[in-house]
Amino acid sequence: MPILFDCNATAIQVLRDEASALLESVKQFQEPNDLEAIVKLILKSQEKGGKLVIVGVGKSALVAQKIVASMLSTGNRSAFLHPTEAMHGDLGMVEKNDVILMISYGGESLELLNLVSHLKRLSHKIITFTKSPTSSLSKLGDYYLSLKIKKEACPINTAPTTSTTLTLALGDVLMACLMRAKNFSQEDFASFHPGGLLGKKLFVKVKDLLQTTNLPLIAPSTSFKDALIEMSEKRLGSAILVNDNNELVGVLSDGDVRRALLKGLSLESEVKHFATLKPKSFKNLDALLLEALEFLERHKIQLLVCVDDRNKVLGVLHLHQLLELGLKA
């Protein structure tokens, strides 16, 4: 099927329409509004063990679920409630000190309107996101933020596009205000994302990834040939020279090997003659991975050899392991 329109022009128009709506919405925060009261309400609810329950139907339900996810990831108790399911038992998830946020662009959704009276009966405060404070839903609510837009970005001005983008943005506004009110830090964020990059930077320690077995340990008197075999078998790109007490003597890196070969040294030569003696080592196993990465890059080495206070080898960590985790110094 031939495309009889300019896709790029359409993309530009959609993005401009949505960006324009976001900028237009800034005006509501330059005039008297309920934002600060809403933030205080949610914080007070949290102090009493309550949560933010977000309600929506259709596309608003999907947006509501994203806002819930953002709230949870920043330490704010939150849950999604579908209005239809609420009328058939799920209302039981709403607890005494919870605050309710109801999202409906038009503010006339029957599912939400039917639910409001039950929530009000239970003395819950209602926040509404709708296009007008005079909508049926917002008139029943206690606090309001505007979703007013000039038009949807879709070609026929009907599919939720601009309105859902603005709704997401208002959810971000709430989240950001709560984060600032609670002095939410990078460390706090990482604690909720232990598997993410920030979590790895802030929480995973050297000892958590340290390889302590199958190490390429060799004696200083080992032949160059046998050292190469050990390096090949252990696949760390290096061999570690230790004495009879397992104390670190040197490291044979792939760079050392190349330099030795260029010099034409015999394969039977003892490895101690061309290894790096008294190499850089690392003692703090409680150090974060980022500190280990900075150490490796600062000394321009690839293998972090960890030792104890008596210089005995405990294990290793390779630069590639850290880079594969997405870490950058």
Swiss-Prot record:
Gene3D superfamilies: CBS-domain, Glucose-6-phosphate isomerase like protein, domain 1. GO terms for molecular function: ATP binding; isomerase activity. Residues 38-184 form the SIS domain. This is Uncharacterized protein jhp_1324. ATP binds at residues 56-61. It comes from Helicobacter pylori (strain J99 / ATCC 700824) (Campylobacter pylori J99). Keywords: ATP-binding, CBS domain, Nucleotide-binding, Repeat. Belongs to the SIS family. GutQ/KpsF subfamily. Coiled coil: none annotated. One of its GO terms (biological process) is carbohydrate metabolic process. Pfam families: CBS (PF00571), SIS (PF01380). Residues 211-267, 276-329 form the CBS domain.
